[in-house]
């Protein structure tokens, strides 16, 4: 009897571990697994408004660009990005300026107004960006705090759509 139960349990585990290369999410978007052998490097980086790289707390995009360059990612997701703020410069768009230093494309998603400018998240891409989406993620009234954002891009790699 124990042997039969163990065999059924093993069969259930094997059946539940089937490998489906594609699936649809609740919006009908298809997630694509890249072809075997293709490595895609994704880096996430909380840049703290680019202030954490300098002892004087001044924005240092060159230092951030060097950190990213050494990792050689295909995509970089950035958190705490300043755009035209007083604290990091009214002419500084951190996502745009970092992308230019790295030869990448970019998309910025605003979360909130901050210090005379905007503050949010961004994605940098070595691959041409086909589509961009931005989502505001407001805090619940019962749990007040700082609103967040979600930044999504669509690129094509080897003839397949990839969302980052």
Task: For each feature predicted by the language model, list its residue ranges.
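Positively charged n-region of N-terminal signal peptides that target proteins for export
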Residues: 1-4, 19
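Sec-dependent N-terminal signal peptides
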Residues: 4-14
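N-terminal, active-site-proximal structural segment of metallo-dependent hydrolase catalytic domains
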Residues: 17-106, 112-121
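Active-site-proximal beta-strand elements of phosphoester/diester hydrolases
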Residues: 39-52, 133-135, 152, 161-164
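Conserved beta strand-loop-helix elements of the APE1-like EEP
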Residues: 100-101, 117-132, 156
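Active-site catalytic loop in hydrolytic enzyme cores
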Residues: 128-162
